[in-house]
Amino acid sequence: DYGIKQLESLIDSGYKIDLNQGMDARLVTDEIAQILSKLKWIRYLRFSCDSTPQIAAIHKTAELLGKYGIKPSKMLIYLLVTSDLANAEYRVEQLKTIRGISIYAQAERNESMGITPNKLQREFAQRYVYSGKFRTLSWTEYARGKGLID
């Protein structure tokens, strides 16, 4: 409730805002979508998609925001790329059905827990998604074309 009140207080402030951490789309209700639509954004409304259950919520959020005039092209989705590349590919394929949405992939890294991205995770995030190849090719098609997988 506190965060929502803070956002509401910014509506007529004249400030352009940027919530640079990915918001949780599962928390976006009709009321929150309406509040988000009234704010002035620097560029994107940023959401995260770290796991498969978040996909449906992102689709619903895009629909709710659309109801209040916010196009999917104003949405950026942070996509966590774990060692399960099939799951990352699935999430990308599901998200790209929201026409106009932007995706920023980040390979999982947590050195204190011994997690560092492997070569394929880095390729997925830095070359496949960042270059926009995901819009026309599946990860499997891209990786086979590059000789990364059989």
Which ranges hold each PLM region?
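Core AdoMet radical
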Residues: 1-61, 74-81, 102-106
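Short, conserved SAM-binding segment of the class I
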Residues: 64
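Auxiliary Fe-S-binding modules of radical SAM enzymes
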Residues: 67-70, 78-150
